[in-house]
């Protein structure tokens, strides 16, 4: 599915010229907190799906400079309420129930042939290799390509994501998708599948049994395992990528999908002593490939046992950008499990030591422990997607991966090796689309 400016239509917010999607773990929830909800409005023209997300009741912090208003979403801010806003689910059970309902509603829009294509057995190992950082023409995805659906079906598919994800998580995902559409429209890439996304269900949608939502395309691979009986949700494994890191949509709004991750990462880095930073940067940064086997390497680095309580919390804030994509309860429980083994977790860092995208080539870091593996890696290449005046390499091209060595895919399957030689970790200088090399011409 190709999305043009996923944050373009601001229906009730007035003159906002910069939108910076941030993910923040919501530590408190109150009854009067009505967060912004993104409502996909899909239209088809010239074979391209245009997505306009109406943002209402937006919680913002704003500063004014030269007549331009800058708005930054923040989960700790109180939100203005509007009749069209809905609140995030705050419990795991609510998320499972509303996501199952949205999935059933989506299935109801499909033909028998489409239903057969989108539904797999829960223990089908296909799901372990059908997600990737590569565009959809290079790695086969499971399920249905949203470009093959009607407008009604596309809207229903996006409602599944809206039910599954928190507001901040949904904003981050749609901003990633908007960035891929930006590359399609503005870059030198000849890859015409940019901006296309697939959706699949492994197991029947249910609030009483286990099933999975898989959604992804280039620089996006969500694997959400929901188990109503156990009352659990896990997003392990999930791939979030960004290219470019900053882009301007058709409404003139500046979109920064990973600004929240960068802010959290540098808050952690800056909290360290010089000695701790030296140990951290001397460590071994690892990167596992999306949709491939992983040895969850630790290597040398700074351990959780070396951190103060405050530093541990800042590290958990970083991790929450991946494990906390859904509701508050799910996030709290996942972080508690990770915190219990944090002393055994190894963190390593390479690259820049200040958050300044105007200098250097970006950062890479990894966090590897008994039940968490997060890797963040700047790609030293544009993958043939160059844009005049816009950085699409280093800071501007990032791959991330989140996995749980103890609970990938809700322990429903064993990870298989990537097929077709497309399992490369996407390290700096690696070849291939999305990995620093140029995709072949079509």
What are these regions (language model features)?
Residues 1-56:
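Sec-dependent bacterial lipoprotein signal peptides
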Residues 5, 12, 29, 84-85, ...:
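Exposed, low-complexity/repetitive linear segments and helix-based recognition motifs
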Residues 55-85:
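Bacterial lipoprotein signal-peptidase II cleavage site
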């Amino acid at each position: 599915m190709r999305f043009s400016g996923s944050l373009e239509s601001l229906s009730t917010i007035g003159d906002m010229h910069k939108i910076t999607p941030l993910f923040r773990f919501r530590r408190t929830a109150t009854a009067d907190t009505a967060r912004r909800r993104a409502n996909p409005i899909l239209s088809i023209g010239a074979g391209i799906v245009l997505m306009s997300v109406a943002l209402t009741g937006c919680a913002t912090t704003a500063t004014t400079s030269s007549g331009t208003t800058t708005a930054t979403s923040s989960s700790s801010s109180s939100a203005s309420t509007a009749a069209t806003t809905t609140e995030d689910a705050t419990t795991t059970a609510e998320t499972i129930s509303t996501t199952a309902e949205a999935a059933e509603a989506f299935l109801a829009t499909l033909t028998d042939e489409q239903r057969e294509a989108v539904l797999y057995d829960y223990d089908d190992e296909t799901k372990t290799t059908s997600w990737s950082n590569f565009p959809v023409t290079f790695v086969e995805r499971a399920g249905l390509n949203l470009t093959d659906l009607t407008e009604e079906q596309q809207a229903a598919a996006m409602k599944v994501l809206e039910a599954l994800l928190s507001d901040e998580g949904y904003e981050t995902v749609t901003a990633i998708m908007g960035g891929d559409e930006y590359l399609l429209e503005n870059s030198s890439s000849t890859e015409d599948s940019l901006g296309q996304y697939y959706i699949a269900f492994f197991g029947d949608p249910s609030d009483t049994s286990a099933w999975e939502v898989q959604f992804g395309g280039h620089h996006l691979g969500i694997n959400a395992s929901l188990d109503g009986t156990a009352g659990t949700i896990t997003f392990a494994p999930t791939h979030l990528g960004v290219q470019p890191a900053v882009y301007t949509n058709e409404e003139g709004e500046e979109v920064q999908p990973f600004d929240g991750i960068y802010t959290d990462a540098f808050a952690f880095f800056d909290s360290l002593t010089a000695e701790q930073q030296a140990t951290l940067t001397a460590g071994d940064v690892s990167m596992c490939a999306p949709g491939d086997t992983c040895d969850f390497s630790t290597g040398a680095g700074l351990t959780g046992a070396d951190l103060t309580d405050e530093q541990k919390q800042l590290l958990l804030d970083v991790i929450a950008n991946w494990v906390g994509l859904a509701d508050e309860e799910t996030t709290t429980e996942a972080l508690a499990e990770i915190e219990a083994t944090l002393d055994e977790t190894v963190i390593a860092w390479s690259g820049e030591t200040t958050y300044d995208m105007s200098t250097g080539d970006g950062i890479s870091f990894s966090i590897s422990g008994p039940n968490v593996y997060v890797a963040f890696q700047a790609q030293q290449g544009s993958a043939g997607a160059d844009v005049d005046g816009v950085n699409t390499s280093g800071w501007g091209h990032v791959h991330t991966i989140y996995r749980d060595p103890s609970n990938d895919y809700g322990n429903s399957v064993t990870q298989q090796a990537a097929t077709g030689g497309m399992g490369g970790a996407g390290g700096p200088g690696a070849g291939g689309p999305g990995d620093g090399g140029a995709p072949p011409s079509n």
